[in-house]
From Swiss-Prot:
InterPro entries per record: DXP_reductoisomerase, DXP_reductoisomerase_C, DXP_reductoisomerase_N, DXPR_C, DXPR_C_sf, NAD(P)-bd_dom_sf
Residues where NADPH binds: S10, G11, S12, V13, G36, K37, N38, N118, E120, G199
UniProt signal peptide: none
Binding-site residues, Mn(2+): D144, E146, E215
Name of the gene this protein is made from: dxr
Enzyme Commission number, as recorded: 1.1.1.267
Protein name: 1-deoxy-D-xylulose 5-phosphate reductoisomerase
HAMAP family the record matches: DXP_reductoisom (MF_00183)
Chain residues that bind 1-deoxy-D-xylulose 5-phosphate: K119, S145, E146, S170, H193, S206, N211, K212, E215
GO function terms (MF aspect): 1-deoxy-D-xylulose-5-phosphate reductoisomerase activity; manganese ion binding; NADPH binding
Cofactor(s) the record lists: Mg(2+); Mn(2+)
Lineage, broadest ranks: Bacteria, Bacillati, Bacillota, Bacilli, Bacillales
């Protein structure tokens, strides 16, 4: 039996993590979890899974947890307690935003393996996180379908034989639209992703291609690859999740249906694989797989992400923080879709980069840029 903790149990990845635990009751047990303000779901999780400890967002919410048999904690300190809970064998960090960074560090320092779905952890502090993981002999297993694919392709391979990583991208909600047409798209249009079921923020990031940019930065740290050896490729079916090309010109790809439960299960079960009852990939039904070179003029946020990691230091922190704020401003109807990339680029150009920042500097800059509201 493997004991699982989940940060962000009420989110898209978190609820799918619960599905996996539900499907394998003799293999996995939920022992700790956090939710934001979704107290109704928290009570259902407690009733079904009987965990030991739960974290809610605010102190006043503690009394709304109906079970007396569970320890209830709250806020950022509560997240830290969940992350390092002594019974955790693995922590699924699916909390959104840089608030997930400190709990990741805390879990690593307590020797707990990480199933990582929180992009910001590696985007803003990848070098620090991977160094800590090596120091504490902790496995970081990616849950993003693209990074899980690369991780699987690299099983048993020698790192020095890698020629390049190829990360696929669906193109998001607006892949069929011209750039001119993007000026007038609505929030409702943006939230209709053609392939994946995801939260609002990541769906917008997929439409701008910032999501793919964040994944490029994650891959740079997860797989210790120079940025010029990480490519992106448009693949609208989301069947090939990513590929690795080796120095002998061979290419290994990982394929599957667009279902996040697959990489979650792989992270939970690694280095084993568990049989799973789910829709299986039928390539005859798919019929064809389409590929297209990435257009950096069309997807400027992806270019900004390449620029940010090439510059390094605190630049990815600024890019990520501003993106988080302006995506919310777009969702709130305050700015247009193309304003997202314009504002991010402007703020990046104005930033004085600090190289080799420590964790506190990263968090200070992150908070500084997230405290602002951005005008067009």
């Amino acid at each position: 039996m493997k004991n699982i903790g989940i940060l962000g149990a009420s989110g898209s990845v978190g609820t799918q993590g619960l599905d996996i635990i539900r499907q394998y009751p003799d293999t996995y047990k939920l022992v700790s979890f956090s939710v934001g303000k979704n107290l109704e779901l928290a009570n259902k999780i407690i009733e079904e899974f009987r965990p030991d400890i739960c974290c809610v967002q605010d102190k006043e919410d503690i009394d709304k947890i109906q079970s007396s048999s569970i320890k209830v904690v709250y806020g950022n300190d509560g997240l830290m307690e969940i992350a390092a809970y002594v019974k955790n064998d693995m922590l699924l960090n699916s909390i959104m935003g840089s608030i997930g960074l400190k709990p990741t560090v805390h879990a690593i320092k307590h020797g707990i393996d990480i199933a990582l779905a929180n992009k910001e952890t590696l985007v803003v502090a990848g070098e620090i996180i991977m160094q800590l993981a090596r120091e504490y002999n902790v496995n970081i297993i990616p849950v993003d379908s693209e990074h899980s694919a690369i991780f699987q392709c690299l099983n048993g391979e020698d790192h020095k034989h890698i020629e390049k990583l190829i990360i696929t991208a669906s193109g998001g909600s607006f892949r069929e639209l011209s750039r001119e047409a993007l000026k007038d798209v609505t929030v409702q249009d943006a939230l209709k992703h053609p392939n994946w079921s995801m939260g609002k923020k990541i769906t917008i990031d997929s439409a701008t291609m910032m999501n793919k940019g964040l994944e490029v930065i994650e891959a740079r740290w997860l797989f210790d690859m120079p940025i010029d050896k990480i490519e992106t490729l448009l693949h609208k079916q989301s069947i090939i999740h990513s590929m690795v090309e080796f120095n002998d010109t061979s290419v290994i790809a990982q394929l599957g249906t667009p279902d996040m439960r697959m990489p979650i299960l792989y992270a939970f079960s690694y280095p084993d694989r568990l049989a799973r009852k789910a829709e299986r990939l039928n390539l005859a039904e798919v019929g064809q797989l389409d590929f297209k070179a990435m257009d950096f003029d069309r997807y400027r946020c992806l270019k900004l992400a390449y620029d940010a990691i090439s510059i390094g230091g605190t630049m990815p922190v600024v890019m990520n923080a501003v993106n988080e704020v302006v995506v919310q401003q777009f969702l709130d109807g305050e700015i247009g879709f193309l304003d997202i990339e314009t504002i991010i680029e402007r703020e990046m150009n104005a930033h004085d980069v600090i190289q080799s920042p420590d964790l506190e500097t990263i968090l200070e800059i992150d908070a500084q840029y997230k405290s602002r509201k951005y005008e067009v």
